[in-house]
């Protein structure tokens, strides 16, 4: 498929669309294990419904739960609808041996069909630790140059296939590498009813998109083969952007804020930008290797930095780019990721690479690393501003998008909370999983604040399967509810030993569910698959899927995730339901 002179490949959620990239590098370290990866299993109906019922019970009255159990029994009866749907799902799995029965459905349902803004509801951020290096590293352009140089080194390994496939655990289990295709030179494109993701060829698109004072700039920071310039030369290019952008009073209308709008609204605004004669400019922005945002603001506290990374003022961003590096005027920095085709596993690996490259102690007298893979610069193309032609209709769209974004910001609160009383090591001395312990603490906290129990989601990564992404761990259980009630309602009457016993049962339940989810045997993804093969247009229906407890049990008022990295100050994402 082509758009003017530059070719691109486009997907609507099926990882197989770009399979040619893997096949062209099948012998490379990054992709050579792909064909040997196990396929995502289809769990049995019995184990899925056992997990589902146990997790639904804490959210239901006794009468509601009996109705839910009755619907499940009817679904599971011999020769019933459940068997038919399971057979269809197994057949789909066999038909997609080169992928996964779930991947395309999940990419569409969870991401590309979602019509809300990506910022807040899809995007996630990482707050990098401050640079401990020399003063030059801590300036805005110095920090940005150091990070960008490391990112471009990582990109060379990705597009060349020389990056080894990621492995996990003591057994060094290989993980699927498919998502790496969507890290660089990729951009989500809005549509009225569903989005698409475009991949541009790295060759010929080694430029980066730099945003400064709401303006877009195409900046060349590598040679023709993608080898990055030195940090010093990259810094010079970034300083040239700052000089071109001018003082704050010269800011232009922020085209970038359109990418923060709802997807149908942004799709219509994008069509208008194309009609205004901006096709080539949009293409250069979307085809860029990544985006780098040089912000005027200087957030100090972790909460201030978190908000600035998570959404900022919405103007100096391109929220559809897979990777955006954000650097503030005081040198604080982080990453903003677009989630539709790529989970956090690849980007945390990128972050680890960048942090180790930029936090190292080996600098020369000028403050630059003594060893770096860089291309000598004989001549360099100056940064090119992308100055959009804006019709009155486009100008009105920008004003409306700004107002919508500002209202959305005002509806959100964020606070980075740090607990210093004890940590994971002390929790482990009690033979308790730190992750499960924190999940139970969250359950107790919600009940203390609201007097309610909330459906709680925690992802488990299943990248060890071909085209696997995540499974769902349901953190609320009967065991968790029993412990919370013992702590809150009966703490004066229950001895400590009994409450500790209940905590251990709750933790064991969570750990067991987590282990099953890590094997792609969670209830939610399987139930989604069964609902997808239901032929509702032919009169098929099941009370399982219309049961209010089913809806309530997957209405994630609390959405959580577990990630640890020594060089991240914080990280996060937004709520997944309006009252979450």
Task: Give the residues covered by each predicted segment.
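Long, Pro/Ser/Thr-rich low-complexity/intrinsically disordered regulatory tracts in eukaryotic proteins
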Residues: 1-321, 329-331, 338, 342-580
